[in-house]
Amino acid sequence: MTLPLLSVSSDRAVDVEADALVVAVSSEKEGLRVHAPEGLEFDADGLSDIGVTGGRDEVVRIAGTGTAARTIAFVGVGSGPVDAVALRYAVGSATRQLRGVAHVAVAVPVSSLVDLTAVLEGAALGTYSFDAYRRDSLAGQKPRATAVTVLAQGDSWTADDADEAVAHATAVAGAVAGTKDLVNTPPLDLYPATFVDAVHERTAGLPVDVRVWDEVALAADGFGGILGVGQGSTRPPRLVKVAYSPAGATRHLALVGKGITYDTGGISLKPAVPMIGMKYDMTGAATILEVVVAAARLELPVRLTAWLCIAENMPSGSAIRPDDVLRMRGGTTVEVLNTDAEGRLVMADGIVAASEEHPDAIVDIATLTGAQVVALGERYSAVMGEDALVARLLDAAREQGESMWGMPLPEEMRALLNSDIADIANVKPGNPAGGMLVAGVFLKEFVGRTGDEDDAPRIPWAHVDIAGPSHNKGGGHGFTGKGPTGVAVRTLLALAAGFSRA
């Protein structure tokens, strides 16, 4: 993970020496609008003649004649408002597509500190690449930018504010890139024990506490879901607790993440083609790890606890079978009718463990169901759970420009999970209807109460299914290239920041 060096300058765009100067262009009813920085003028009709439309993800380069820059790159911001979300997307699209430019200067309309931070984030996010396994790290392509300078003048922020914006953007982009790096790592190299190593590496020097349950401790403490899923592999499972508890924090947000380092489906084996890409099944755990890392770097005044539920789901003579019963943390028994519905089993243990600390809220995140992709496609995450918490998550996602959609948890679906011999079954075999919702209903069963009393209310809880948007299988868009997306990192950070102000 290498991020570009970010900086903010009040210099005039025309005077800045850079390999590329990024200028924003809008598509409006009246025609093309060039958001020209001070000291520069552009002929909108002339730009239209060479194919500039102002559409999103459009980047057109011309010679930097009349400026100190080598080239000028016009990036489209679309036809909507030129706000923080649009600017983050557009600038990220520019840095993702610009190659062979070591230093990029960005001169887009920045009217607030929020805009400035978003532009810095987008610039850093767009430069991501993963080349750890390539002989030629560039794969024949020119390198991306190593330095980005945002040119902005404003009366609403100080130099210290600009420095904080740079620090914030660096932490956020680092968290997204860290998530992508983990998800990109092949399962031969990333398995439960090495995932734990990565946790220690990412948290080194930060004010966080890490506790690890190995297979012996998991058995002693009754984590039957994580143990059951992992028992078919020669590489035993782990549960990792990463706790950030700053002095003075009055609110506690717990995060639970699915960390299946490879999902073959177990005895309920996946077909060959759908199995490709199942290294992505640990995205939830990687996401919450990086959220805590970023929160600690930013010194957010909120207590965060991440529960990484890590296992490898493999078929073998020791693997769990359909018809087996697992006893979960807390004592609930689960009849396993499909071993490929394993994510909910490890997550249930994590939710119970998180509940035992009586946090103010629990959010779990997982690449949980193929049904999520069927329902919402490959760019929208599903959110379900307690209404107020779901609303806060959706607001945070909207603020960050991440696509999430609220879904119901119908009470009548609980009956579909009735078991003849256990407290609950993990699936309803042969009934694909509402599969994403059924998984959410299953997880809800394990959410604890706000206190030790039997009649205490349930802890506010939300479930985020990122099965589709965790992986971009097509071409790049905005600051997101092909491969893992780091979806929900920014939303969960924004949610945590909101908790710190509550």
UniProtKB/Swiss-Prot annotation:
Reactions mediated catalytically: Release of an N-terminal amino acid, Xaa-|-Yaa-, in which Xaa is preferably Leu, but may be other amino acids including Pro although not Arg or Lys, and Yaa may be Pro. Amino acid amides and methyl esters are also readily hydrolyzed, but rates on arylamides are exceedingly low; Release of an N-terminal amino acid, preferentially leucine, but not glutamic or aspartic acids
UniProt xrefs under InterPro entries: Leucine_aapep/pepB, Macro_dom-like, Peptidase_M17_C, Peptidase_M17_leu_NH2_pept, Peptidase_M17_N
Entry annotation: catalytic residues: 270, 344
PROSITE patterns: CYTOSOL_AP
Record's subcellular location: Cytoplasm
Protein name: Probable cytosol aminopeptidase
Keyword list, A-Z: Aminopeptidase, Cytoplasm, Hydrolase, Manganese, Metal-binding, Protease
Gene that specifies this protein: pepA
